[in-house]
Amino acid sequence: MVSIAVSGCAQIGAPTGGPRDSIPPVLITASPKLFTTNFKGNKITLIFNEYINVLDVQKNVLVSPFPKTSPVIDFKLKTVSIKLIDTLIDNTTYAINFGNAIVDNNENNPFKEFTYVFSTGSTIDSLKLSGKVLMAETGKPDSTLQALLYRNANDSSVEKRKPDYIAKIDANGKFTFTNLSEGIYRIYALKDGDGGKTYNSKIESFAFADADIIVAAIPDSVLLYAYEEEKEKKKIPSVAVKSAADKKLKFTPAPSKNLQQDLSSNFELHFNNTLKNFDTTKIVLTDTSNNKIEGITISLDSTRKIVSIKNKWPVNTYYRLIIAKDAVSDSANNLLAKSDTFHFKSKSESDYGSLTLRFTKIDLAKHPVIQFLAASEIVRSVAVTGSNWSDKLFIPGEYELRILYDANNNGIWDPGNYEKKLQPEKAITLDKKLTIRADWDNERDIDL
């Protein structure tokens, strides 16, 4: 795809009244004609049967092979004119793919998937290469990526020069290169962050094939898995100067909703400031008779803003958490305004649903992990070690299910590394979501 200069005349107004025009424009004449061989000129003219527009040329029009200098596309009334600026390569088939960019002036009916093809040699190359790109972490397609194809390439070509061919990736992750000559190619996929058409940032989504691709008379298909080697760092918004009230050390208990403690989670205190000092002896968990609960673990997380109380929570049990005023202090030596006591209870079994998953055709040798996602965030991951898995106390809600093939068996998804030629770990997102109902036996058969 190239950055294409484009100009056009003022739009011709559509007539009012009558039935809606649903007929796309028709190509009447192409000069030189479509599939011309031994092409020598630098101008192409397309004449249609009605007034047309060319929409979003930069996005919709692909020129292959990729020229060094962009052609100029001009449209006026019923005519599209293309001026080729770049020197054409001998014995090469060129394709100018307009996609759905050419539309009629009245109702924007597209002249669908139109490609103007010509050759500077005596034949038109007609080989194709199709494939699919999926995001490795999710197993889902991403149509914002593009497929890149190189001739006469080495490992560094994708980092140093623009590709010879580019293909769009559709909503299903599929792509097709057309009008190729027989030969050896290298294929990649890229979400191009800076428009340079090269892989130059580890935060760009990228995919590569393990070996060269041979394009021959018998068509082949390629499957690529894209990844970001490094996650883009989120921009931290500027912080307004705190008022005196905001500077006070405060915290919020979690869970805060009705103070119902999940049986498998820690009770947490979320502080507004980073803690400097932290005294576990001044944070006490008791029962309702004021008997101290032994065997708990109190810890501070790496951000030094979350205090966690870990305990084996029996069902439907009431607790008190007593926090002394000087139990914690922040970097400005602020203490809590006062000592505080929280009353809460652990949940009952009826607050949960029972879940049983039965797996068919799952490859345990690939170390599968079942991931439960809520609002696109992984809330639980469980290694699959057999054909059945169950949990009697599963938090109700709607979950997206994902199977991660954890190659290095570390429990998390790992990206690829192009320099080391390491492919990313792969995952599959299941089509059907899982709904867990409280106080209910929930079951799902998963056929992979």
Question: Model features per residue range: what roles?
Answer:
Residues G8-N172, T176-L190, K202-A217, E232-S354, ...:
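Acidic, low-complexity Ser/Thr/Gly/Pro-rich repeat segments typical of extracellular/periplasmic
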Residues K112-E113, D192-E232, A337-D340, S348-S350, ...:
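Structured interaction patches on ligand/partner-binding surfaces of diverse proteins
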